[in-house]
């Protein structure tokens, strides 16, 4: 069994485990094509995967990739001199569309391309149930969420390209709009995740089964909750950790003495929520919304040296049958898989080490960062050719966006 941090470079194994600051932006005038500004709004988990991590990795490679709010003149200044602005899960509301169209026209006059980025299906009526649930967290009514779905799609129609995480999600987008789409798979900042997680020493020495995630439909977690109830009764020495959204059915399934609750940490300490998990659970019901997801939770568990049990939806292709993790789709299957890993330490360690190596080599930054500039270059080049755009004086308008 390897020890946590074995994949870190020597300078990252220092005693204080300080996570380095984001790298300084290069001079936009001298940076290679494409130069990009991520327009952001919220501070949710997707921002790490689809903006902060890849931006930092690319800046270290010499690219100009800035991010911030266009409403903020100071951060928006970093959009000056860029080839494209990427809207990260943002759109114009209905009353803002005329302003948005004027903004798009002005950027096109300057030769700048406008792209949209999303890692979930945020535009399909088929996903309304899950989107209603997520919208309720922000105080939105079902009607307001439905309106936001339509406005988001209207915004995409007006933009020059879309980046998404998977071919499945790309197919969904292509079925709803003619806007060109490029796929950029998710990749974990391996060293960052391990550095940050090491800042949260393990507090509970018991073998710990864990789940981490945001608010979701109960269909995702119901089979797992029943399995946890059975496993907790069979193995009273095992602990169960719920990190992030405190899913009621998971909490109710486990006696208080075996339960560990952990809220989400701020983004700069996000990985600490996973501390102490030995077996990570990734349950997903087979729904249209979930089919567009990626196996990022399993990547995060890999960085924590945890063995993984996951639903076939999304995870079957990544884990394979018993090669990198175990698959389960019913309460009985979840119970069997968890019990195997509790009782067979060698299997648990082998799967964890094998999966960690796989993720580190094939699904991590900086190695996979190059997919971003390749996708941007293709979308920008196609848009400029299609619209007859030329590079002009880089000016940026402010103050007309809402998430």
Where are these regions (language model features)?
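Nucleotide-sugar-dependent
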Residues: 124, 216-219, 264-303, 309-319
